[in-house]
Regions:
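Surface-exposed, charge/polar-rich loops and edge strands
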Residues: 4, 95, 104-109, 117-121, ...
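Short glycine-rich anion-binding loops that position phosphate/pyrophosphate groups of nucleotides
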Residues: 40-42, 114-118
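Receiver (REC) domain switch-region micro-motif
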Residues: 34, 109-110
Length: 177
């Protein structure tokens, strides 16, 4: 159902509205480091977020999928969007950059999803990349799930390995939920 709904959404416009909501948040203003996914076509556009993080002097880290089929990724600090090239699954990933062992305390993590429910259960693409990321890197700073309002459902199924989000950690084009 979420995949069908996504096809009718203008992810560029939704991403632009989310970006404006994000830039008004204290979590954005206070973060010295931002971890952000590089959006795919069917996700809210994060280009302006990546550009602003770099322009404002924030340390910007993006994910790079590791070889193999175990759903792992690493954090890579980039200094330019020119550092990105299509990688695994056709997703833009860093072709160089410095691998980061852990996010510093207070770093802001921006996480994608296919959908989320009102209790914070996140539906991803099924490979567990971001659940492993959140568990492995022990996010100590704020985290926000970027999800279009149309894809916030009353309830979704959860697995025991799913990392939950709490109220106040879901950002839509209408603000924080």
């Amino acid at each position: 159902q979420a995949k069908a709904l996504r096809k009718n959404l203008d992810m560029h416009a939704i991403g632009a509205a989310m970006t404006q909501q994000l830039f008004a948040l204290p979590a954005w203003r206070q973060a010295g480091t931002v971890f952000c996914f590089v959006s795919m076509r069917d996700e809210p556009d994060t280009t302006a977020i990546l550009q602003q993080a770099l322009a404002s002097g924030k340390r910007l880290c993006v994910p790079r999928c590791l070889p193999g089929n175990d759903g792992r990724m690493e954090l890579v600090e980039i200094t330019s969007l020119n550092d990105l090239q299509p990688g695994r699954y056709g997703i833009l990933e860093p072709c160089g950059g410095r691998t980061i062992a852990a996010l510093e305390p207070g770093a802001l993590a921006l996480i994608p999803c296919l959908a989320v429910d009102k209790q914070g259960v996140r539906l991803g693409r099924g490979a567990g990349y971001y659940d492993r990321f959140l568990t492995r890197f022990g996010q100590t700073g704020p985290k926000l799930l970027l999800c279009p309002e149309a894809l916030v459902f009353p309830a979704l199924p959860a697995d025991e390995w799913d990392v939950p989000f709490t109220p106040g950690e879901i950002l839509t084009e209408n603000g924080v939920r």
